[in-house]
A protein has these predicted regions:
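Active-site environment of divalent metal-dependent phosphoester hydrolases
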Residues: 17-23, 40-46, 69-77, 97, ...
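Active-site-proximal beta-strand elements of phosphoester/diester hydrolases
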Residues: 8-17, 100-109, 136-141, 199-205
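Core catalytic region of metal-dependent phosphoesterases/phosphodiesterases
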Residues: 13, 18-98
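Active-site-proximal loop/helix segments of hydrolase catalytic cores
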Residues: 17, 23-26, 116-135, 139-150
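Hydrophobic, well-structured mid-protein blocks that either form specific transmembrane helices
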Residues: 83-130
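Active-site-proximal segments of metal-dependent phosphoesterases and phosphodiesterases across multiple
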Residues: 45, 53, 112, 133-179
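Divalent metal-coordination and catalytic microenvironments
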Residues: 15, 37-38, 63, 68, ...
Length: 235
C-alpha cells in the first residue's frame, strides 16, 4: 500500500575517479547512496575492490552503482567486476525497486575518444528505448542534451558547447518522464535543474581540475497522490 508523503532520501555522487577516500566523512546520511559512474581512476578490478571496501563502510542502508566511461573493468572483465562489487547493487541497462521507488541505471554516453561504454552514432535510440516507462529515478552516467552538459569550446574562446545526448533527452521528455535523473560525466556542469516534472542532478564529485571538491547532491523523494516528486533536500 502506497504511503502518502513517504520520504526517501537519496545521497548522490559521481566521478570520484579513485579519490573516494577523500570524501569519507563528507557524505550526509540518507536511505540510498547513488554513484553515477566513474568510480575508478585506472579502471582496474583491484581499484574496484578498494572502492567496494569503502562503500561497505558507508552507513546508507542501500547503495546503487553504475559504471562510467573510465570504469574499464565493467566492460573488459565484467564477471570479475561484478564479483568484486558486493557492497552495492550494480545496474547496467537494468533496474531495481527499493523502498517503493523504481530505479534504472545505464552507463552509456555518446562516443568521445576511445573510452568505455561509448555509444556509436545511430546506437542511441536502441539503448534508451530499453528504459521502462515507470521509472521514478533514472541514473545515467552522462547528461541529456542541453541540461547540465556545458563544456568550454576547445576551438573558440568564451564559447560553450553542449555535449549531452539528444536522444536521451527525447526519451526522458517524451517517454519516461522520471521524477529524477541523476548523472555526472561533465564535471564542469555540476549542479541541478528542474524542467517540467523532472529534477536533473549533475552530481560530479570532481571538478574540471579533477579535484573531489563538489559536495554530494542530496535529494528527497516524496510520494504524493500523483506519484513521486523529487526535491533538493534542506541540510
Amino acid at each position: 500500500m502506497a504511503i502518502k508523503n513517504q520520504r526517501v532520501r537519496l545521497v548522490c555522487i559521481s566521478d570520484t575517479h579513485g579519490m573516494h577516500e577523500r570524501i569519507s566523512g563528507k557524505l550526509p546520511e540518507g536511505d540510498i547512496l547513488i554513484h553515477a559512474g566513474d568510480l575508478l581512476g585506472h579502471g582496474t578490478v583491484e581499484e574496484l575492490v578498494d572502492v567496494n571496501d569503502w562503500l561497505a563502510q558507508q552507513p546508507h542502508p542501500h547503495k546503487i552503482v553504475i559504471a562510467g566511461n573510465h570504469d574499464a573493468a565493467f566492460q573488459t572483465t565484467p564477471e570479475d567486476a561484478r564479483t568484486a562489487l558486493t557492497s552495492a547493487t550494480y545496474l547496467e541497462d537494468s533496474g531495481i525497486d527499493i523502498l517503493g521507488l523504481t530505479f534504472w541505471g545505464s552507463p552509456w554516453t555518446p562516443r568521445f575518444m576511445n573510452w568505455y561504454f561509448m555509444l556509436q552514432p545511430g546506437e542511441e535510440a536502441q539503448c534508451w528505448d530499453k528504459i521502462p516507462d515507470d521509472v521514478d529515478v533514472l541514473i545515467t552516467h552522462g547528461p541529456p542534451k542541453r541540461i547540465l552538459d556545458e563544456v568550454p569550446d576547445p576551438f573558440e574562446r568564451y564559447r560553450i558547447t553542449h555535449v549531452g545526448c539528444p536522444v536521451l533527452l527525447d526519451a526522458i521528455t517524451r517517454k519516461v518522464q522520471p521524477a529524477l535523473n541523476v548523472f555526472g560525466h561533465i564535471h564542469e556542469a555540476y549542479g541541478h535543474r528542474q524542467r517540467t516534472q523532472t529534477l536533473y542532478v549533475n552530481a560530479s564529485t570532481c571538478t574540471a581540475r579533477y579535484r573531489p571538491d563538489n559536495p554530494p547532491m542530496v535529494v528527497d523523494m516524496i510520494r504524493t497522490d500523483k506519484g513521486w516528486r523529487a526535491e533538493l533536500a534542506e541540510l
